[in-house]
A protein has these predicted regions:
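Rossmann-like dinucleotide-binding cores of NAD(P)H-dependent redox enzymes
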Residues: 1-42, 151-159
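Mid-to-C-terminal Rossmann-like scaffold of FAD/NAD(P)H-dependent oxidoreductases
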Residues: 107-208
Length: 226
């Protein structure tokens, strides 16, 4: 027996949106999972937990997913912008340093012109590799006495396998409104996420091979860019 509690109204609400999140919830419920959503745990006991509404749940094992917090404490006092990570420019150079310094991975908050000029941290599996490559190019240019050039337009991506469902995502779905473009919410489908008429994310449910076509549509001047 498994019970899930979370503050959001639907599971995976931020990366998937309400409709697809509700579909995932129904799929888990069909496999016997119980949900208590819209609230958190207020008290732990030897044999379970108590929720905000007073519900007490018995449990042999409690697993807490606390998320991630940028570890920037050691950088305090350096006049850097440490609001939600380390602020960098598009080429991964840390903003506010007297000498060239780069930051990469989940800690770096940088603008991605594929979407807009707002600096964001991206906690997706492929970004540490992509930002590391870009930072290496930046440092290589600087060490060679040249100014780094070029737009850095990484494509965020994640996947999740749950029971017989395979989720694959490209772009930043959390920034857009979900639109079902193929299939059904409750089954295999492809969902685009639109902002001001522009595709900024896509999620496929058991449609990984079909996503390549939609992936090319994501972001500013997306076709032909990678």
């Amino acid at each position: 027996e498994v019970t899930v509690t979370a503050y959001d109204a639907e599971p995976m609400l931020r990366p998937l949106g309400p409709e697809l999140g509700a579909a995932m919830k129904a799929h888990h419920e069909a496999h016997g999972v119980t949900f208590h959503l819209g609230q958190g745990v207020t008290e732990f006991h030897e044999d379970g937990v108590t929720l905000a509404d007073g519900t007490r749940l018995a449990a042999d094992v409690v697993i807490e997913a606390v998320g991630s917090v940028p570890n920037v404490e050691w950088l305090h006092g350096n006049d850097l912008n440490l609001e939600d990570g380390v602020l960098t420019d598009n080429l991964m150079r840390v903003v506010g340093t007297d000498v060239p310094v780069v930051a990469v991975g989940d800690i770096a908050r940088f603008p991605n012109p594929r979407f807009d000029d707002v600096p964001r941290r991206i906690e997706h599996w492929n970004l540490p590799t992509e930002t590391g490559k870009r930072a290496g190019q930046t440092l290589g240019a600087l060490l060679g006495g040249e100014e780094p050039t070029g737009d850095f337009r990484p494509m965020p991506a994640f996947w999740s396998d749950q029971y017989d469902i395979s989720l694959q995502s490209y772009g930043q779905p959390s920034l857009g409104m979900p639109t079902l473009v193929d299939g059904e919410w409750s089954g295999d489908c492809i969902v685009e996420y639109l902002r001001d008429g522009e595709v900024i994310g896509v999620v496929g449910v058991n449609r990984t091979k079909d996503l390549m076509h939609y992936r090319k549509e994501i972001g500013h001047e997306a076709v032909g860019s990678a």
